[in-house]
Amino acid sequence: MEEMPKTYDTAAVEQRMLDKWLEGDYYRRSAGVGDCTVTIPPPNVTGKLHMGHAMDDTIQDTFVRFNRMRGRSTRWILGTDHAGIATQTKVDKKLAAEGISRREIGRDKFIDACWDWTNEYGGFIVEQVKRMGCSVDFSDPHFTMDDDYAKGVRKVFCD
C-alpha cells in the first residue's frame, strides 16, 4: 500500500485537476435548451489579476455552472482589454527604467514594445483564470484589439 504523503502538494493537485478539465473540454459551449452566454468584463493587460477580479469571476462562474447544471447551453467567453493609455504608461515606465524613452525609439518600436507587454501580461492573466478553476471556454479567447472588436467599436462610436 502506498504511503500517504506528509504534506498536501497543492500545486500538483491543482495542475492535475486543471489538465483533466482542459483535456476533457468541459468548458466549451455545452449542449442544452436555452442559451446562457457571459462575457468576462475583460481585465486590462497592465498587470496581474487581484482579489476584485477573483470575486467577480467567482460570481460569474457560479452563475454559469448553475445554468449548466440546469441543462442550459452555456458559454463563458474569456477576454482581455488592451487598456491603451494605462499600457502606454506601464511601457513608458519600463523604458525609463532602461534609460530610454518612447520618443527615442520611435513610434513603430514603441508600438512593438506595447504589444510585447500585452502578450506577456495577457498570457499571464489567462493562466491566472485557469488556475482559479474558472469554467471559461478557453478555446476562443478575445482581445479588445482583435479586428472584429475594433470594427464593432468604430461602428458604434464613429459611424
Residue ranges of predicted features:
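N-terminal, positively charged nucleic-acid-binding surface of large information/translation enzymes
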Residues: 1-159
